[in-house]
From Swiss-Prot:
Name the record gives this protein: Argininosuccinate synthase
Native source species: Prosthecochloris aestuarii (strain DSM 271 / SK 413)
Pfam families hit by this protein: Arginosuc_syn_C, Arginosuc_synth
Residues noted as binding ATP in the record, renumbered to the chain: A9, Y10, S11, G12, G13, L14, D15, T16, S17, G117
The keyword Nuclease belongs to this UniProt entry's keyword annotation: no
Domain of life: Bacteria
EC numbers for this chain: 6.3.4.5
Gene this chain is encoded by: argG
InterPro entries according to UniProt: Arginosuc_syn_C, Arginosuc_syn_N, Arginosuc_synth, Arginosuc_synth_CS, Arginosuc_synth_type_1_subfam, AS_cat/multimer_dom_body, Rossmann-like_a/b/a_fold
GO cellular component: cytoplasm
Residues binding L-citrulline: Y87, N123, R127, S176, S185, E261, Y273
Oligomer status and interactors: Homotetramer.
Catalysis performed (reactions): L-citrulline + L-aspartate + ATP = 2-(N(omega)-L-arginino)succinate + AMP + diphosphate + H(+)
Amino acid sequence: MSKEKIALAYSGGLDTSVMIKWLKDKYDAEIVAVTGNLGQEKEVENLEEKAIATGASSFAFLDLRKEFVESCIWPALKAGALYEDVYPLATALGRPLIAKALVDIALENNCTMLAHGCTGKGNDQVRFEVTFASLAPQLAVLAPLREWEFTSREAEIAYAMEHNIPVSATKKSPYSIDENIWGISIECGVLEDPMTPAPEDAYQITTSPEKAPDKAAVIDIEFEQGVPVALDGKAMEGLDLIVELNKVGAAHGVGRLDMVENRVVGIKSREIYEAPAATILHFAHRELERLTLEKSVFQYKKNVSQDYANLIYNGTWFSPMREALDGFIEATQKTVTGLVRVKLFKGSVTLLGRTSPWSLYNEDLATYTEADTFNHKAAEGFIHLYGLGLKTWSEVKANNS
C-alpha cells in the first residue's frame, strides 16, 4: 500500500527544513516540497537539492511573479487597498497565491494533506488555512509549529544536526523578515517596543532618507484604466516596472513605513515595512483618481478601499465578497488613464503634475481670472436649497426652546 502524501509550503529555512523530516516520521508519509517565487531576493538556488537531501520525495519550484503582479498586485492597487491606511499588503497578498499553488500541486500529486510553517499567533496561518478551506476543503491541514515539541530555534538546530538535515546554524538575525516584489515586512527584536526607533540594520533595501541623494528624482508614470504601463515614456511590463520603481525609490529612501496594526488574531503588532514601488504607485494612482473620478464615486470608493484591504489582510481573497468588490472597482477604473509626475527626495514622494484625457478638471470653471465661465448668480438659489433643511431645523429648535 502506497504511503500518504503531504504537500508542504517550503522556504528552505530552518523551520520548513526540520519540518520535512518531522512530518515524514510522524505521519509515515511522502513529502512534496513546494516553493513559490514572488520576487524575493533571498537565495532560491539549490532549494531542490536541499529539499531532497532533507527527505522530500519530490520538489516543485513555481515562478509566480507575473501572476502575482497581474492577478494580485494590480487589483489591490486599483482598489487603493492600504490596510489601516498604511500597509500596502505585500505579505498578505502573496499568501493566498502561494496557498493556491500548494493546493494545485497537492491535487496533481494525489496528496491528502497540506502543511505550512506559520506560527500559532500570526496572520499567515489564517490566510493559508482559509484559502485551503476555500479551494480544497477535502484536504487535511497540518500546522507543525502549533503542535511540535520544539520550543526554541536551538532545539530545532539540535534536531537538524541529529538527523543530518542541511541547515545553516549561523547566528540568526534578531528580526523576522518576509519579502516579495511588493514589499518587505520586518518585525521582532527591538522593534517589539513601539517607542524604539527602528535601527538602520532592520532595513533591507532602502537608503536612510538622511543619506539619500541631494538631487531629487523626477518620474513620469503612465496609467491605463488604473494599471501602470510606462515610466518616463517607456512602456514596461508590470514586473519590470515594479522592479525599477523599487530600485529608484529605495535609493531615495522612499517607502519606509512604521505602524502598529491590528492582527487577525486579536493582538496589536508593531511592524516595519519597506515598499518603495508600492508607496509611489499608490500615491500616483490616488492623485490620478482625484482628477478623473466623479465626486460621489471618489468619496464612496474610499469605503470600498478599506473593505478590500481588510479582506486581503484577513485572508479572504478567494471569496464572493472580493469578486463583488472587483466589479465595482473595475467600473471606477475605466477613466483612470493618464500621466502623473512625481518627485522622489529624501524619503518623500511629492506630486508635480497630472494630466488625463478623462480629466474632470475644467480650468474655465475653476479659474478666478476673466476667463471664468462659472455662473456666480446660480450660487444664490443653490445655497438657499442646500441649507433649507438646516434652516428649518434651527427654526423648530428655537420655537421649542
